[in-house]
Amino acid sequence: FKCFPFVIVAINILIAVASDFESAIRAWGTTWVSTEGVTLYGGWHNVFNGVAGLINIACMTGWFGIYVSKKKQDMLWPDMTWVFIVAYDIWNFCYTYNCLPTHSWYCGLALLLAPTVANFFWNKGGWIQNRANTLAIWCMFAQVFPMFQDESKFAVQSVNNPVSYTHL
């Protein structure tokens, strides 16, 4: 049980890393349309973010310190450092913007911010479970109401402007 949460998070990150590398390979310096019908711009930013994802996996600490709370309601990972959590949030937002641009506001910012704020202020050590919960809720919502993020007035489109990717 001790390594199960680590393995799940690592697999989740590896899937995102593969997506970043796929965008880089398919469309270096140009755009391509994903299987979901979303236009993506590929390039160095995808490679950079993919490597950052691999570094995230290498920097996960304290996974043998994971335990279940006394009331058996929460999985706690108290050794998960705030530095890792913030780095993961930044990396994951970059991933959603690069590879899931229609999800970047809701899935990226809102769902990353909720477990991070909870972890910092009132649910110490509960970040991983809160992150899993917010991700699961979003995935279920997105599957039931796919047009919310794709075509409604709440849809958020990426600029897909090559200039924004090549000039810092």
Each model region followed by its residue ranges:
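Generic multipass alpha-helical transmembrane bundles of integral membrane proteins
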Residues: 2-125
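Hydrophobic alpha-helical membrane segments
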Residues: 11, 132-150
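A cytosolic-side transmembrane-helix exit/cap motif
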Residues: 23-31, 125-132, 151-159
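Non-cytosolic membrane-interface motifs at loop->transmembrane helix junctions
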Residues: 42, 157-163
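Hydrophobic alpha-helical transmembrane segments in multi-pass integral membrane proteins
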Residues: 92-94, 143-159
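Conserved small/polar residues in nucleotide/adenosyl-binding loops
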Residues: 166-167
